[in-house]
Amino acid sequence: MKKILLACSSGMSTSLLVTKMKEYAQSIGEEAEIWAVGQDKAKEDMRKADAVLIGPQMSFLKSELQKEADQYNIQVEVIDMMAYGMADGKKAYEQALSLMVNQ
């Protein structure tokens, strides 16, 4: 099962995207645990994830979060702006999968 963490300022703006990503994963027959947290819980929760996507408003924290993620051998990336704005679950899910290629 793929485990994908989404983080944004409060965890609210990514909740719709989480739903859309889950729907897409289910539609292609994949099992995925996808959840959202606020930026204050991102470092704590990332140890349970295979990939971390962060909201565009958190892009300034990417390098700090990646340093933390390195100890768990996971990648952190800013959610594609179009996928984020359009709540495109397919695009965001595929972005998360691309971060897991080397695992």
From Swiss-Prot:
Chemical reaction(s) catalysed: D-cellobiose(out) + N(pros)-phospho-L-histidyl-[protein] = 6-phospho-beta-D-glucosyl-(1->4)-D-glucose(in) + L-histidyl-[protein]
GO cellular component, one term: cytoplasm
PTS EIIB type-3 domain span: 1-103
Transmembrane segments: none
Induction: Up-regulated by konjac glucomannan and by cellobiose and mannobiose, the possible degradation products of glucomannan. Repressed by glucose via the carbon catabolite repression system. Also repressed by GmuR.
Keyword terms of this UniProt record: Cytoplasm, Kinase, Phosphoprotein, Phosphotransferase system, Polysaccharide transport, Sugar transport, Transferase, Transport
Role of this protein: The phosphoenolpyruvate-dependent sugar phosphotransferase system (sugar PTS), a major carbohydrate active transport system, catalyzes the phosphorylation of incoming sugar substrates concomitantly with their translocation across the cell membrane. The enzyme II GmuABC PTS system is involved in the transport of oligo-glucomannans such as cellobiose or mannobiose.
Entry note about domains: The PTS EIIB type-3 domain is phosphorylated by phospho-EIIA on a cysteinyl residue. Then, it transfers the phosphoryl group to the sugar substrate concomitantly with the sugar uptake processed by the PTS EIIC type-3 domain.
Protein name per the record: PTS system oligo-beta-mannoside-specific EIIB component
Organism: Bacillus subtilis (strain 168)
